[in-house]
Amino acid sequence: MFKRYLQVTKPGIIMGNLISVAGGFFLASRGEIDWILMLATVIGLSLVVASGCAINNYIDRDIDAKMQRTRNRVTVNGEMSGKAAFFHGIVLGVIGFALLSYFTNWVAVAFAAFGYVVYVGLYTMYFKRKSVYGTFVGSLSGAVPPVVGYCAAAGQFDAGAAILLTMFCIWQMPHSYAIAIFRYKDYEAAGIPVLPVSQGIAKAKRHIILHIAAFAVVAALLPLTGYVGIGFMVVALATSLWWLAMALRGYRPGIDVNGWARQVFFFSIITVTALSVTMALDFNEVSPNLLVFAAH
């Protein structure tokens, strides 16, 4: 029984978000860590993410049944009813937002709510099914966790938080396009208009390369504005350039497109994990305090 209630929350997505929210929190803490606040932020946001995923599974039952990758989800194979998944998601969301509201600040809660509404309301219910821009809309919600972590610790939205939001939003694009390429048949069967399906793999390749290049530029803004040190700059440039070189290999004659897309996808995870860990460790002790919107 417990297993299906865990599976419906997409634990892999939760774990990925744990790393980014912790990275944002440690970056903003600048060595002065409130461990109770950190724990409450991580648990609270994890529950909010779990809630969104459970409700996403409830809404997506029809298209999940058409995709090889998702047809065995508990909401599709009958192990869990849609009603149970929905109310499970509601309970998790209430607890998660309650924790964030009690322990953090209105800025962090507002961004968590923004991400939730975008993911469940805009992305899941409309853009994923109807628009090629669904990936971009989804990327907005996917970029929220590190910003929530940052704002929970800093008590404000500043240039550092803005850079994190932009950086993680851009990162989502090549990451998601790569998935859409090697899962092309699934998305086509479900009628989901992701870029490779609706406008072709060639265009998706170009977008992957452009977004990786943009990601490298935005990631460099954190050290250039004084939020992190040279160590982050080195890791950011090394991983971004390697990722870009990997993406450019997609133009080699006779390339196995699915294999190439999987490599781009897996390295995207390595890149964002490396940067999340590095920004947690290589912070500057004094914040530049640029573009400040305080919580108090």
Curated annotation (Swiss-Prot):
Instruction: Identify the CDD domains for this entry.
Output: PT_UbiA_Cox10
Q: Which reaction does it catalyse?
A: heme b + (2E,6E)-farnesyl diphosphate + H2O = Fe(II)-heme o + diphosphate
Q: Which HAMAP family match?
A: CyoE_CtaB
Name which cysteines form disulfide bonds: none
Listed InterPro entries: Protohaem_IX_farnesylTrfase, UbiA_prenyltransferase, UbiA_prenylTrfase_CS, UbiA_sf
Tell me the protein's name: Protoheme IX farnesyltransferase
Q: What is its EC number?
A: 2.5.1.141
- Organism phylogeny: Bacteria, Pseudomonadati, Pseudomonadota, Gammaproteobacteria, Oceanospirillales
Respond yes or no to whether keyword Cell membrane is given for this record.
Answer: yes
Q: Which UniProt keywords apply?
A: Cell inner membrane, Cell membrane, Heme biosynthesis, Membrane, Transferase, Transmembrane, Transmembrane helix
What stretches pass through the bilayer? 8-28, 35-55, 84-104, 107-127, 132-152, 162-182, 215-235, 264-284
- Endpoints of the signal sequence: none
Q: How does it sit in the membrane?
A: Multi-pass membrane protein
Q: Where in the cell is it found?
A: Cell inner membrane
